[in-house]
Amino acid sequence: MSNRSVCREASHAGSWYSASGSQLSAQLDGWLSQAQTSKRPARAIIAPHAGYTYCGSCAAHAYKQVDPSVTRRVFILGPSHHVALSRCALSTVDIYRTPLYDLHVDQKVYGELWKTGMFERMSLQTDEDEHSIEMHLPYTAKAMESHKDDLTIVPVLVGALSESKEQEFGKVFSKYLADPTNLFVISSDFCHWGQRFRYTYYDESQGEIYRSIENLDKMGMSIIEQLDPVQFSNYLKKYHNTICGRHPIGVLLNAATELQKNGVNMSFSFLNYAQSSQCRSWQDSSVSYAAGALVVH
């Protein structure tokens, strides 16, 4: 490897998760040991991207479905929190650092994606500011530990895509989703509820506020399980649920739909749901987390 490799530092280590490799490794092992293997080998997972103290245990339910003996390449699709982006962006770096070990960007696949003319590049600053991809790197490194020398990653920052763009990017990624050696990690939290998020939808028939939030999230989750991008868009238009990874999810649903058209049989199931706290009053706030996996039959 030439010493000209560009590295992205683990900029959220020490704040959003432990910067100590041994401590982080033990934490991840602990969370994974609590989760069941039920949807292996996963071809895609949806998992949250909050600080690990909030969502580490939830995310484990998705990462437990990853089979390192099958997977060779991990696509990580995360939403853009800090920059306005109407397309998807690729990184400019060769290596993503984690406290566990360095992850290498798959430059061959990056070249193929770049050739489509549909992608832009994100700056190193944007890359290091963004947490939606980074929060999946330690878990990816842990899940793939036994085959780390064969592993490459394909980080993709997903912008505020229109429905037609979600469809176009779904088509582009569908050929990669068809390959059993690829895993797609879709980075998303679910409802951000409370005045600080400017979202306070409440269905009183559900009882306590946190129950209304759960009901709203599970409505969206069941649509995702049906792999129906149109219904998912309609749900978001109707309820405006603050699912921050709605566009990465939309891309996955469109990619899956594309494969189903070609006779590929697959199923998606959510395996865990959690809330950062239980909202009972208008002063409260919470973020919801869900973990699920897509299996191709």
From Swiss-Prot:
It comes from the Eukaryota. Pfam families: Memo (PF01875). InterPro entries: MEMO1_fam. HAMAP family: MEMO1 (MF_00055). Interacts with ERBB2. PANTHER family: PROTEIN MEMO1. May control cell migration by relaying extracellular chemotactic signals to the microtubule cytoskeleton. Mediator of ERBB2 signaling. Belongs to the MEMO1 family. This is Protein MEMO1. It comes from Xenopus laevis (African clawed frog). The lineage of its organism: Eukaryota, Metazoa, Chordata, Craniata, Vertebrata. The gene is memo1.
